[in-house]
Structures are given as structure tokens and as C-alpha cells.
């Protein structure tokens, strides 16, 4: 039994209302893991072979997630529903690098390499999964959440990236 089915069962047994939010990668000042690695790489100005990637990625800024949770807690129509949630602006990996560079106030250094070549080299180096995440698509349509609950994210993708980049640059200055 999946986690959603368990929650629905608990709701049926107890009468407790539930709301399930499915979310993509969250970015936030203080971010770590792969997103931090991408910030570091873009900030160093290294040329990246990511130009022309035609994937589609959804992201969610932590401020938008917090606001959406407040909306869910206050809105009676949210009860016992499942919603997909994102910033609402899907981007390719290439576009994400460009937006991060803009937030860092540096030029994006992208060049094109055939995707097959990158995948082959990644396979030899044992990095296929990491490259698959860079090239793959993962997007969520949050239109139902917006329509049902009248939600408008308080932060655009660029605003969230600006706040995250500002944190990153301050952390470099402050050690």
C-alpha cells in the first residue's frame, strides 16, 4: 500500500481532513546537494556543455511552498485533495543555468555538445545517473492548485533564484 493510500485510509478512519502536495526540487537559501553543486559550478564561470538541452524541469522556491501550505491550511476547498505544486515556470537545464548566472550577475558560459556524446562519456565515467538528471524532464502542472484555491506564487522563479544566489554569495564572503 502506497503512502497516499495509507493517508486516505487514516482520513477515512478518523475523519481527519488531509491534503497531499506533490512537489518538485525545492530551492532555498542554504540549499545543498545537486543544486548547490550547480550554483558553485556556474559561479566559478566554468564553461558547461549544456546549451540546447530541450528538457523541462519544474522547481519550487521555499517561500512559495510556505505560502502554499498557508493557503491549504486556510482554504476549505483544499480538504482531501491531491495537488501538484511548482513555481509555475518550467525551464530547461540550459535556461536554469542562464537564470542562475543572471542571479549571480555573471555571464552564463554554455556551449553545445551532442547529447549522445555526453551520455557515452558519462557512462564510461560511471556518471550516467547524474547526467540523466541533468538531461531528463520532470515537470508538474500546478494549474489545478492555482485554479481551485486562487493561489498565485508570491515569488517568481527568478526572484527565488536571486534570493538563493544572494545567500550563496554572502556565504562565500562570510566563510
Language-model features: locations:
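Conserved C-terminal active-site "lid" loop/helix of NAD(P)H-dependent oxidoreductases
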Residues: 62, 95-98, 121-152, 163
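Mid/C-terminal beta-alpha module of Rossmann-like enzyme folds, strongest
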Residues: 71-129, 158, 162-165, 172-175
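Glycine-rich Rossmann NAD(P)(H)-binding loop
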Residues: 28, 50-55, 83-90, 99-105, ...
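Short aromatic/basic micro-patch
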Residues: 20, 59, 90, 139, ...
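A short C-terminal helix-loop "cap" of Rossmann-like NAD(P)-dependent dehydrogenase/epimerase domains
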Residues: 39-50, 106, 142-143
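Substrate-positioning beta->alpha
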Residues: 2, 31-37, 51-74, 80-84
Amino acid at each position: 500500500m502506497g503512502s497516499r493510500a495509507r493517508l486516505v485510509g487514516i482520513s477515512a478512519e478518523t475523519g481527519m481532513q488531509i491534503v497531499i502536495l506533490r512537489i518538485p526540487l525545492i530551492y532555498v537559501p542554504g540549499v545543498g546537494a545537486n543544486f548547490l553543486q550547480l550554483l558553485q559550478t556556474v559561479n566559478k564561470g566554468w564553461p558547461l556543455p549544456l546549451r540546447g538541452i530541450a528538457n523541462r524541469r519544474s522547481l519550487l522556491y521555499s517561500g512559495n511552498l510556505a505560502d502554499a501550505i498557508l493557503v491549504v491550511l486556510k482554504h476549505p476547498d483544499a480538504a482531501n485533495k491531491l495537488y501538484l505544486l511548482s513555481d509555475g515556470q518550467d525551464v530547461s537545464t540550459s535556461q536554469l543555468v542562464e537564470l542562475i548566472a543572471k542571479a549571480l550577475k555573471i555571464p552564463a558560459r554554455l556551449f553545445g555538445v551532442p547529447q549522445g556524446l555526453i551520455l557515452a562519456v558519462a557512462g564510461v565515467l560511471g556518471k550516467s545517473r547524474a547526467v540523466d538528471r541533468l538531461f531528463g524532464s520532470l515537470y508538474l502542472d500546478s494549474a489545478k492548485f492555482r485554479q481551485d484555491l486562487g493561489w498565485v506564487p508570491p515569488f517568481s522563479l527568478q526572484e527565488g533564484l536571486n534570493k538563493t544566489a544572494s545567500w550563496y554569495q554572502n556565504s562565500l564572503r562570510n566563510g
